[in-house]
């Protein structure tokens, strides 16, 4: 109850109270509460809480699908609203997936020596599409119910198969996950490690997600070949996600500053000018 105003919001889709991580921003106040929520959770967990990317992806795709439909006569916005209503009603965790492995940065997706360096459509049917490729550096994927996939860069004519956005279950047929390690992973298995603050059970898992002819039904597709709108998703996501970093990283920074100040007190050096200068900076 203490943090209910920060952690929940009223859905513009259903009128119900929802987890703010599933909320679609409607005002400046929503954006302020979002970043305050993220700073609070950074302070409380001192770790990545893994739902920010999905929230930022949803807000980018929500507005972009509306504009795509207006320009192209598609039904992507209707698809997304239906999907996201289910997300809100069930409080599903959603991983936002943007980063491709990319290959030669000087070439567009369709000009790469290996076509799978960017996730793309390999077959279209009356019922949907099959996609192949990979998304890298997926921090919250293992702990999410769904993945919301977006293009990673602006597209141009010839890149139509790469201008694709969709959602699917994180364990859909054809998906393989490669788990990355962190240098301090084994600390979680040591005895008497309760001194560590943070999410010791679920924090820090990062995967490379490989899609091998994964089928995406039509009603889960939010962009499919409309190249000029790929960049719009990227730009809007980037704006939302930069704001998120201004919350979560600052919250974790608060913990680091506090821990450093405590270490200074315990070492008897808290009044040293160079220690105070570093803490103030």
Where are these regions (language model features)?
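Internal helix-loop-helix
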Residues: 2-94, 140, 146
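Short, well-ordered alpha-helical packing segments
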Residues: 81-88, 119, 126-128, 135, ...
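Generic secondary-structure signature for well-ordered alpha-helical cores
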Residues: 89-92, 216, 262-265
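Conserved short loop/turn motifs at secondary-structure junctions
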Residues: 67-73, 101-102, 275-280
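Conserved aromatic-histidine-acidic binding/catalytic patches
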Residues: 68-75, 199, 244-248, 267
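FAD-binding core of flavoproteins
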Residues: 99-248
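Intrinsically disordered or highly flexible coil/loop and linker segments, enriched in small
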Residues: 89-96, 100, 220-221, 269-273
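Extended amphipathic alpha-helical segments enriched in small hydrophobics
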Residues: 244-281
């Amino acid at each position: 109850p203490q943090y209910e105003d920060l952690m929940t919001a009223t859905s513009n889709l259903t009128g119900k109270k929802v987890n703010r991580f599933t909320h679609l921003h409607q005002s400046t106040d929503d954006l302020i509460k979002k970043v305050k929520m993220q700073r609070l959770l950074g302070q409380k967990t001192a770790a990545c809480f893994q739902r920010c990317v999905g929230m930022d992806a949803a807000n980018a795709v929500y507005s972009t699908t509306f504009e795509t439909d207006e320009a192209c006569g598609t039904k992507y916005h209707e698809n997304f609203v239906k999907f996201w209503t289910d997300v809100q009603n069930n409080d599903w965790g959603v991983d936002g997936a943007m980063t491709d492995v990319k290959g030669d940065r000087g070439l567009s997706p369709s000009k790469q020596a290996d076509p799978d360096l960017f996730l793309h459509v390999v077959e279209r049917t009356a019922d949907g599409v099959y996609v192949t490729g990979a998304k890298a550096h997926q921090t919250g994927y293992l702990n999410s119910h769904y993945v919301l996939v977006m293009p990673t860069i602006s597209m141009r004519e010839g890149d139509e198969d790469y201008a694709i956005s969709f959602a699917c279950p994180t364990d859909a047929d054809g998906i393989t996950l490669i788990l990355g390690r962190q240098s301090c992973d084994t600390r979680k298995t040591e005895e008497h490690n309760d001194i560590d603050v943070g999410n010791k059970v679920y924090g820090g898992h990062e995967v490379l997600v490989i899609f091998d002819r994964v089928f995406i039904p039509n009603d889960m597709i939010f962009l499919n070949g409309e190249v000029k709108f790929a960049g719009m998703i990227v730009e809007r996501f980037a704006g939302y996600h930069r704001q998120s970093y201004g919350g979560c990283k600052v919250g974790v920074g608060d913990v680091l500053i506090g821990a450093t100040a405590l270490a200074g007190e315990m070492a008897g050096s808290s009044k040293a000018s160079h220690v105070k200068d570093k803490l103030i900076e």
